Regions:
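C-terminal accessory/tail domains of diverse enzymes
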Residues: 1-247
Length: 247
C-alpha cells in the first residue's frame, strides 16, 4: 500500500505491522502506556500490567458477549497457566503449538481428532480433560478462600466445562448447530435473529447504570478534546519522534 496516497498519509510505515501493538498472538502481554511512549519500551522496563486473551470469541448466546460462568472459568484458566511451569520455547515448539491451535479450531468437533504434544499423540478430548482435571485443585482453593457464602461456583463451573469436553453437543458450537438445524435456517439468518433478540434484551435491561456509563463516556470525550488542544505538534514530526523511541 505504501505510506502515502495522493499526498496524504495512509499508513505509519510500509510494513504489514504498523506498531508493536498490532503483533497479534493468542495471548498478548500488555501494559498501560503513557502518551508518546513506545509500548515495547514500557513493557520491557516496567513489566507486564495485564494480558489480553486474544483467541476468545464473543459468546453469541449472551447479549453482552460473555457469561458469568465464562468469566469464572477464564480466571481458572489463567491461574492454572500461571502456576504451571512455562519454560521458554524454541521456534520449532512454537510451530507445533500453532499446529495444535489450528487443528483444534478446524477439527475440534471431529470425533477422535488428534494432536501432537510433548507426551506424544493424543486426542483433543483427552488433552482437554487432562488440562481441566489439573484445574480442580485451584478451583477448590478458590471456593474455600475466595467465594462468598460457601458458594462453590469455581468447582461447579469447572465441572460444567468437563461435561462439555465429554459431550461437544453441549458446547457453544453444538448449541449453535442445533439451533440452526432446528429452525431450518442458514447461518446469516441465524445471526440476524440473534441480533434482534439481543437488541430486545438490551433495550429492556434495567437502566440503573445508564447515568454512570454516560458520565464515563463524557469524561473520556472531554479528556480526548483536552489532549487534542494541548498537542499542537505536527503529526509527521510526532511520528518521527515516536518511531525513533525504540530502545
Amino acid at each position: 500500500m505504501g505510506e502515502f496516497k495522493d499526498g496524504e498519509r495512509i499508513q505509519l510505515n510500509d510494513s504489514i505491522i504498523q506498531i508493536e501493538n498490532e503483533y497479534y498472538s493468542t495471548i498478548r502481554p500488555k501494559r498501560v502506556c503513557p502518551t508518546g511512549d513506545r509500548p515495547i519500551n514500557v513493557l520491557e522496563a516496567e513489566g507486564i500490567d495485564y494480558v489480553e486473551l486474544r483467541c476468545i470469541d464473543l459468546n453469541p448466546s449472551s447479549f453482552i458477549g460473555i457469561t458469568e460462568e465464562q468469566v469464572y472459568f477464564l480466571d481458572l484458566l489463567i491461574l492454572y497457566s500461571f502456576f504451571n511451569d512455562s519454560p521458554e520455547i524454541t521456534d520449532s515448539e512454537s510451530n507445533e503449538l500453532f499446529k495444535i491451535h489450528k487443528t483444534v479450531v478446524n477439527e475440534g468437533r471431529m470425533p477422535g481428532a488428534m494432536i501432537k504434544t510433548n507426551a506424544g499423540k493424543t486426542s483433543i478430548k483427552d488433552e482437554a480433560l487432562r488440562i481441566l482435571s489439573g484445574m480442580k485443585e485451584i478451583a477448590e482453593f478458590m471456593d474455600n478462600e475466595v467465594s462468598e457464602n460457601g458458594d462453590r461456583v469455581w468447582s461447579d463451573y469447572l465441572s460444567n466445562q468437563i461435561t462439555v469436553a465429554e459431550n461437544l453437543d453441549l458446547a457453544l458450537s453444538g448449541n449453535l448447530l442445533k439451533d440452526i438445524q432446528d429452525q431450518d435456517i442458514n447461518f446469516q439468518e441465524y445471526g440476524l435473529r440473534l441480533s434482534h433478540l439481543h437488541k430486545h434484551q438490551m433495550d429492556n435491561t434495567s437502566p440503573k447504570n445508564d447515568h454512570s456509563f454516560s458520565a464515563i463516556a463524557n469524561e473520556s470525550l472531554d479528556a480526548a478534546e483536552k489532549i487534542e488542544k494541548e498537542n499542537q505538534i505536527d503529526f509527521e514530526d510526532y511520528l518521527k519522534e515516536f518511531l525513533g523511541k525504540i530502545s
